Amino acid sequence: MKASVNYFYKGVTHEFITSTQKFSSDFLSKDEIKINDVGNGGCKKNKYERDIQLLENALKTDSKNDRYLFYLGNSYRDNNEYEKAIECYKKRIQLGGWEQEIWHCYYNIGTCYKKNNNMSEAINSWLDGFQHLPHRLEGIYEIIYYYRCKGKHLLAFHFYKMAQMHKDSIPNEDNELFLMKDVYRFKLDYEVSILGYYINIENSVMNRLCLELLNKNVPSYVENSTLSNLKFYALNLKKETSVGKLPLENLTQIGKNITKKHAFEYHPSTPSVCMHNNKLYVVVRFINYYIDQEGKYKSKNINGTYEPLSRVETRNICSVFHFDCNKLIKEDEFEIAYDNQFDCYYKGIEDMRLFSFKNELYFTGTTITKHPGLHTHIEYGKLDLENKRTYSCLLNIENKHPVEKNWVLFSNNDEIYIIYSWFPLTICKFDETLFDKKLCIRDVNIHKRVEVDNVFKLVRGSTNGVEIDDEIWFIVHIVSYEEKRHYYHMFVVLDKTDFSMKRYSCIFTFDKTRVEYTLGFVYKEDEKKCIIGYSTNDSNPNYYYVKKEDIEKMMYN
């Protein structure tokens, strides 16, 4: 402010700076100013009572001061004197003037009536505010929220549609008085994310709306609720399955003849599928635990009765198939031997993901290296097909977490890359010269970070990358941590040249089961179809075909 202009504060409280001389004004961003608030009256006792006294005394000599009436109404409202607040707001409306302040009077009258459990008058006042200033939608939001909570979903939705007509009508947010930005940013859409279930909005529409919410960096309660509601809107990929040239029934028989003490000692779980040297390699994880109806991990005795779990065991069975006249012919099956030096309560390599590169079969998996006080490493290595065993090392990264899982591989220009994290997309490289076939710890180095949408802070890796044309495709997963976990999935497509994220799909399930998981898929170029292997409830491995064009129709962006 220029010292040559006679500025002064005006008002008995909620003062503002003005001058009797001519002056110009402009907006400054919050980053350009700093307020040193000395002796802030708002932090002292009896603020509302003091403000009420000051404003009432001032109105005795200036009864038509619109600013005093407005802030007196606010003070009565904040002091829970709702009838007096309503009276002040109505007087302020009668004076006319600044439309922003008048709208707030209507909105606050509605809020006061709501506090007094008079919802009919509250709704009337909020509607009057909308009539006065239709781009201010906070009152309409309150109506939507009220009707949704009362189970009047169709009414709530019609008010939502009204709001959508004006949602983007605010010319400049900085010119709005006390704008409640969260209403416009996510609260309106959050309401319809709940309403959609009750009024049967198409799942694909609701799926996209939920993704938009998750991309807005919303509060945790909105994020958690949206994830929970996705169980109703997630697309069912099984409905998109098609018939392929190769019958897949043989894949469900993998490992049926493994040795075990009784029928329930081990059972098949999640498969990993991979094309390698024109053959199909499938590794099926066999485990000794089951998930009971309460979501707890148990073993089963010889009679199939649940028992407490004394140890978590994994056995990986690899089957090799070649193609003959559109048939899958099994040519070999074996249990993969591994370096067992870290076997403890947890035994075996969990979640092996196969990856073909330069005529060798690579893999990643999870190895628990310490228990109790759980510590896991990503085990990375090669599958020695002649000796039917792994040769591998444990991967380390700077600032490694005690529990590391779900790192996935892809290749480009004769190099292997590792995706460590999906938010930001963090791509690493491993110096292959350090690979010495011993289960020792080796470092990976971050190669590149790529900015991605906010939803990817929830994403974890599922499959290794599959090259399709000039792109690299993945399946990833998201977990909604509720009383019982719910798993969701997405396809993600990276540009092969710069690894930027080109697009990703709407959220789907494999067959609408609560716990689902995949470790791999393959792309059949001759059919333009993917073969996907997955498990449900850590059991029941299954496989199906999906056309690439049907997956493309599911893409979110």
Locations of regions flagged by a protein language model:
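Structural motif corresponding to the intra-repeat A-B loop/turn of tetratricopeptide repeats
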Residues: 79, 116, 150, 199-200
